[in-house]
């Protein structure tokens, strides 16, 4: 079973005695920086000149400097910029400012796991990753609660990396809910697999296939949309609240019977075999290598896939139907 840590297992004074730089001010960056500050931590935010986030961070009372200045000042550096540019930010702004005894923190392990960033031997390399979006992390902190976090130590130069990571997690409210110890390898590989095979890739492909099956059989796109996409939220919310058991308790017996007898016909042994191939490609670095190459080549295939899905009948139908739903916020991303 997983090893769990709570408030009494973490010493907030450890992170309060350090100087923290948060590089990036997106969803997680703002939650980390503001919550650490409110926990009595010396925080600065590192943003490039011209960043649209600078004014927002300053309005919220944070000191903003360049990433290089932030890294030079701090002895705990949390990198929360997007995965594909982390290595560039590290090379340009962090690498030459690291000193023995410093700590390099991440919210996701991809760049360490696959060697895009190779820290020097004298620094701690840790992860603190809340299992929720930044706005929830911040709101829970302000309400005196917290979002569960995972922590990991890839390189423990000081011999006190775990204590530091737990202290950081306490500073953003994580230990109020509970913190699970993991490794960079486990976090990275399971996170990527979950996104690709289930949460994003698997779910999107399942929804599209169901929608296409109904419309190709002559059913109205609007009805197919409701049955294959819109109502998915109702089911996922029940699973989120109480697992498969609560979902099945809440649906009709007809739906539950269909779940048992039809689900295994959709997700077959062949599907699971393909999932294992996906996992292997994550583990051996194939996915990370291909994704970084795609990103740094200007995202041609990425944009092609994005455009194709945007033009899909599922999406055009959904955009019109959501206009009927006053409770749905369908602002353009």
Curated annotation (Swiss-Prot):
Its cofactor is Mg(2+). Mg(2+) 1 binds at residues 191, 195. One of its GO terms (biological process) is L-valine biosynthetic process. Its EC number is 1.1.1.86. Residues 2-182 form the KARI N-terminal Rossmann domain. Substrate binds at residue 252. Pathway: Amino-acid biosynthesis; L-isoleucine biosynthesis; L-isoleucine from 2-oxobutanoate: step 2/4; Amino-acid biosynthesis; L-valine biosynthesis; L-valine from pyruvate: step 2/4. NADP(+) binds at residues 25-28, 51, 53, 83-86, 134. InterPro entries: 6-PGluconate_DH-like_C_sf, KARI, KARI_C, KARI_N, KARI_prok, NAD(P)-bd_dom_sf. It catalyses: (2R)-2,3-dihydroxy-3-methylbutanoate + NADP(+) = (2S)-2-acetolactate + NADPH + H(+); (2R,3R)-2,3-dihydroxy-3-methylpentanoate + NADP(+) = (S)-2-ethyl-2-hydroxy-3-oxobutanoate + NADPH + H(+). Binds 2 magnesium ions per subunit. Keywords: Amino-acid biosynthesis, Branched-chain amino acid biosynthesis, Magnesium, Metal-binding, NADP, Oxidoreductase. Belongs to the ketol-acid reductoisomerase family. Involved in the biosynthesis of branched-chain amino acids (BCAA). Catalyzes an alkyl-migration followed by a ketol-acid reduction of (S)-2-acetolactate (S2AL) to yield (R)-2,3-dihydroxy-isovalerate. In the isomerase reaction, S2AL is rearranged via a Mg-dependent methyl migration to produce 3-hydroxy-3-methyl-2-ketobutyrate (HMKB). In the reductase reaction, this 2-ketoacid undergoes a metal-dependent reduction by NADPH to yield (R)-2,3-dihydroxy-isovalerate. This is Ketol-acid reductoisomerase (NADP(+)). It comes from Streptomyces griseus subsp. griseus (strain JCM 4626 / CBS 651.72 / NBRC 13350 / KCC S-0626 / ISP 5235).
């Amino acid at each position: 079973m997983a090893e769990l840590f709570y408030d009494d297992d973490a010493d907030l004074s450890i992170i309060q005695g350090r100087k923290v730089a948060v590089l990036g001010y997106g969803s997680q960056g703002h939650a980390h920086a503001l919550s650490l500050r409110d926990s009595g931590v010396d925080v600065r935010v590192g943003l490039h000149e011209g960043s649209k986030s600078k004014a927002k961070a300053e309005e919220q009372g944070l000191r903003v400097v360049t990433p290089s200045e932030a890294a030079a000042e701090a002895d705990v550096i949390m990198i929360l910029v997007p995965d594909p540019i982390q290595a560039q930010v590290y090379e340009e702004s962090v690498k030459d400012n690291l000193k023995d005894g410093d700590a390099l923190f991440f919210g996701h392990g991809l760049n360490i796991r696959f060697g895009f960033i190779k820290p020097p031997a004298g620094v701690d390399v840790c992860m603190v990753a809340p299992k929720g979006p930044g706005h929830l992390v911040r709101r829970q902190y302000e309400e005196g609660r917290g979002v569960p976090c995972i922590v990991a130590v890839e390189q423990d130069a000081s011999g006190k990396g775990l204590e530091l990571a737990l202290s950081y997690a306490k500073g953003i409210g994580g230990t109020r809910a509970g913190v699970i110890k993991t490794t960079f390898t486990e976090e990275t590989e399971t996170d990527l697999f979950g996104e690709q095979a289930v949460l994003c890739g698997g779910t999107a492909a399942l929804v599209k296939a169901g929608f296409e099956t109904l419309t190709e059989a002559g059913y109205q796109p609007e009805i197919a949309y409701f049955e294959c996409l819109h109502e998915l939220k109702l089911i996922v919310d029940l699973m989120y609240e109480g697992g498969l058991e609560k979902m099945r308790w809440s649906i009709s017996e007809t739906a539950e019977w269909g779940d048992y007898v039809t689900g295994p016909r959709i997700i077959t042994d062949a599907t699971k075999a393909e999932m294992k191939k996906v996992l292997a490609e994550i583990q051996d670095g194939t996915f990370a290598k291909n994704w970084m190459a795609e990103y740094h080549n200007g995202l041609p295939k990425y944009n092609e896939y994005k455009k194709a899905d945007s033009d899909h009948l599922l999406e055009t139908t959904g955009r019109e139907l959501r206009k009927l739903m006053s409770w749905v916020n369908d602002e353009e991303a």
